[in-house]
Structure formats: structure tokens, C-alpha cells
A protein has these predicted regions:
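Conserved SAM-binding strand-loop segment of SAM-dependent methyltransferases
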Residues: 98-110
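Conserved SAM-binding loop of SAM-dependent methyltransferases across substrates and taxa
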Residues: 61-73
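Conserved alpha-helix/loop element of class I SAM-dependent methyltransferases that forms part
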Residues: 17, 27-51
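Conserved SAM/SAH-binding beta-strand->alpha-helix loop
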Residues: 83
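Conserved small/polar residues in nucleotide/adenosyl-binding loops
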Residues: 221-222
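A short acidic, Gly/Pro-enriched loop at the edge of an enzyme's catalytic core
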Residues: 111-120
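A short glycine-rich, Lys/Arg-flanked "PGG" loop and its adjoining helix->strand segment in the class I
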Residues: 134-146
Length: 222
């Protein structure tokens, strides 16, 4: 197994143990996304989702795709993820809302095979975790209609500079600790006793979300 494959596997195992995001996770990109969907709608349609086939690749626990399906009942929505435990939560939350226009499938983006194309594909904070980022992109594009929209969000080297420093600091502190569960417990303890002065850039998040900050992603700079 290559180093990139090992990193991707470790991320998969982490999300299996700590499904993300939790139900109360705040989506900072919501307003810009809604504005884009509304501004680019065809004449006579409420937004781009109206009557569209929509895919979220790497949907996790389904927060984004559930909210979109709930907002636009005329669209047909599909969420895929390789993390079974996250999908269980997504399906449960979708069933609670009785969403008939949304389905979930266990799929790996690198081997994506849905047998159809989509008008809109969302891939939010996922592609950079893959062992082969280019193959992942090609897989998404192959499922996109010729006039479709691919909406992505990726890590950036400069934008995550302080967060990366936080990760490195904790990696040094916990270099002799192999248990992810123990690392999370120690991190929570640090967060309870230190201020934002030392732990900055979205690292001082509620404890329910701290697990996501342990991801050692496959890093690319563009």
C-alpha cells in the first residue's frame, strides 16, 4: 500500500469511528451556495436544483444534501460516501424528514459507478483526501452532464496555515501515543484549559467536532 493509500485509509477509519459532520455542524458556505444556485437558475425556475439530478460525492452524515433535498422537493438527490457509519446517520436523518427525493449509496469516488449523469455535483471538502486526486476528478466529471455544474471546496495551503501549525504541534505532543481515541481525549483536555490565543483558526471548536481536526489529509497545493 502506497503512502497516499495509507493516508486515505487512516482517514476512512477515523470517519468510521467519528462520523462527520454532526447534526449541529454549521455550514459556513451555505449563503454563498444558495446565492449561486439562485443567481444561475434558468428563467422560470426557482434555482438550479429545481427539477435537477443532484449528486453529493462524499456526503458524510448528509447535512448538506439533506438540507438541499428538503429545500427543493422538485429535485432528485443522491448522496454517496464510502463510510458506512456516516451513511447510517444520513439515512436515519433523511427518514426522519421523510424525504422521498433523496437516496444514499455506499460508493468510493475513485470507483464511482452510478449509471447516470447529473446536472449538479457537489464535492465539499472531500477530493483532497483521495489517494489519486486526478482520478477522483475524472470520475466526477464522467458523471456530469455536458452543461452541468461541478461545485467543489478544497483545502488550500495558505488558508489552512494556522490549522496546519496546530496539527503539527499536537503531532509533536502526542508522537508517542498511537491510540486515536486517546489523542482525541487529550486534545479535548487541552481545549478546555487553553485559550484562542494559542489554538487558532477554527481549532477551538465544540468538542463534538474536534475529531475532524485529526485528519491527516493528502495535501496538494494549487
Amino acid at each position: 500500500m502506497s503512502e497516499k493509500d495509507k493516508l486515505t485509509q487512516s482517514i476512512f477509519e477515523m470517519y468510521q469511528e467519528y462520523p462527520f459532520p454532526d447534526i449541529n455542524y454549521k455550514m459556513d458556505y451555505s449563503l454563498p451556495l444558495i446565492r449561486f444556485l439562485n443567481d444561475n437558475a434558468e428563467k422560470g425556475k426557482k434555482n438550479l436544483l429545481d427539477g435537477a439530478n443532484v449528486l453529493e460525492a462524499g456526503c458524510g452524515t448528509g447535512n448538506t444534501i439533506i438540507k438541499l433535498a428538503e429545500t427543493c422537493p422538485t429535485g432528485n438527490f443522491t448522496g454517496v460516501d464510502m463510510t458506512v457509519n456516516s451513511l447510517k446517520i444520513a439515512k436515519k436523518n433523511s427518514d426522519i424528514k421523510n424525504l422521498k427525493n433523496l437516496n444514499f449509496q455506499e460508493q468510493n469516488i475513485l470507483n464511482l459507478d452510478l449509471g447516470k449523469k447529473f446536472n449538479i455535483i457537489f464535492c465539499i471538502g472531500v477530493l483532497h483526501h483521495l489517494a489519486d486526486m486526478q482520478k477522483g476528478m475524472q470520475s466526477l466529471v464522467s458523471h456530469l452532464e455536458d452543461d452541468g455544474y461541478l461545485i467543489m471546496w478544497l483545502y488550500g495551503k495558505d488558508g489552512r496555515f494556522k490549522l496546519n501549525l496546530n496539527q503539527r504541534m499536537l503531532s509533536v505532543l502526542f508522537q508517542n501515543e498511537n491510540s486515536l481515541k486517546k489523542k482525541v481525549e487529550l486534545t479535548k483536555k487541552i481545549l478546555r484549559n487553553e485559550s484562542n490565543k494559542y489554538l487558532d483558526c477554527h481549532f477551538n471548536v465544540p468538542e463534538s467536532k474536534i475529531e475532524d481536526k485529526w485528519e491527516e489529509a493528502v495535501s496538494y497545493t494549487h
